[in-house]
């Protein structure tokens, strides 16, 4: 079998190259052909082989391979609705790792994925509770890739939130810190219960994640990003996170509170994002039932 040729080191180099190139060509050409290849070889396939096949693809056709990874990221988030579904723990673990949780999905509206500890050391959990998430949906995903030094990925997540007793207490506390006497910047009583109950407790939010080439001395994407020992494909990037909400008091915090207003727009540099789990949902058919459409990787 072709995959066996990849795994037996005693075979001649020309034979290995031929087998690897054949697998690579099929895997990076389209989503449908990638799944067909992995289904045909599922008995012998593992993450190490996926990384090696994609690394070979990167060395022969870097742009097509990166577009394959980005297409897998987009498909998993938008079409498979990874953030919205109730995930089977064992299937999730097969793609993302046994110790991973839903908060580890990149991106999502969680303390970890928002890098709140970077911006709010010591109070990151409180900031996360202020934006109480009940539901989140990936509402937009676009990307363009020219080279490791010229690319952009834009992902928009819409959230439905509801202020509960915990988040209400935190919002009040932050608002009271804006000025003395519990008055907000508009002079109104910031702890009026009517602002946090009933329908007014519900709100929507939009989080826009923009990924661009890394700065600050961080390495750009290369063949070294395909890391077999850690079972990861590390995508280095800066990420800008912009936030808007529909709630009056949250917006007041985003505009006037010295701490919370940092949430409105933040730039985080030199971060690493593992794209392998999104691609292995194709390999292992982790979230079945699941239909792959013949989307060419270079079309976004």
UniProtKB/Swiss-Prot annotation:
Lipidation (S-diacylglycerol cysteine): 20
Subcellular location: Cell membrane
Lipid moiety-binding region (N-palmitoyl cysteine): 20
Broad class of where this protein is predominantly found: membrane
Coiled-coil positions: none
A Pfam family it matches: Lipoprotein_3
Source organism superkingdom: Bacteria
Signal peptide boundaries: 1-19
Topology with respect to the bilayer: Lipid-anchor
Cystine crosslinks: none
Any GO CC annotation of this UniProt entry: plasma membrane
UniProt keyword annotations, A-Z: Cell membrane, Lipoprotein, Membrane, Palmitate, Signal
Family: Belongs to the MG439/MG440 family.
Protein name (database record): Uncharacterized lipoprotein MG439 homolog 5
Source organism (scientific name): Mycoplasma pneumoniae (strain ATCC 29342 / M129 / Subtype 1)
């Amino acid at each position: 079998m072709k995959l066996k040729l990849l795994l037996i080191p005693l075979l001649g180099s020309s034979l290995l190259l031929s087998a690897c190139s054949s697998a690579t060509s099929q895997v990076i050409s389209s989503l449908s052909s990638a799944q067909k290849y992995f289904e045909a070889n599922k008995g012998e396939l593992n993450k190490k082989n996926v990384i090696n096949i994609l690394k070979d693809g990167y060395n022969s056709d870097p742009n097509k391979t990166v577009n394959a990874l980005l297409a897998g990221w987009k498909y998993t988030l938008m079409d498979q609705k990874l953030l919205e579904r109730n995930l089977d723990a064992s299937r999730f673990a097969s793609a993302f790792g046994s110790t991973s949780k839903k908060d580890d999905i990149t991106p999502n509206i969680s303390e970890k994925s928002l890098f709140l500890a970077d911006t709010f050391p010591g109070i990151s959990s409180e900031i996360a509770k202020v934006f109480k998430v009940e539901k989140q949906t990936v509402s937009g995903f676009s990307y363009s890739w020219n080279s490791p030094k010229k690319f952009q990925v834009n992902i928009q997540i819409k959230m439905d939130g509801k202020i509960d007793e915990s988040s209400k207490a935190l919002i009040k506390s932050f608002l009271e810190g804006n000025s003395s006497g519990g008055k907000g910047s508009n002079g109104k009583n910031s702890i009026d219960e009517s602002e946090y109950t009933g329908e007014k407790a519900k709100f929507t939010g939009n989080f826009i994640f923009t990924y661009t080439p890394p700065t600050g001395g961080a390495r750009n994407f290369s063949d070294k990003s395909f890391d077999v020992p850690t079972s990861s494909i590390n995508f280095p990037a800066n990420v800008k996170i912009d936030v808007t909400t529909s709630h009056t008091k949250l917006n007041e915090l985003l505009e006037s509170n010295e701490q919370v207003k940092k949430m409105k727009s933040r730039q985080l540099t030199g971060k690493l994002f593992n794209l392998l789990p999104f691609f292995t949902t194709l390999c292992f058919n982790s979230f079945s039932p699941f239909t792959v459409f013949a989307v060419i990787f270079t079309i976004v």
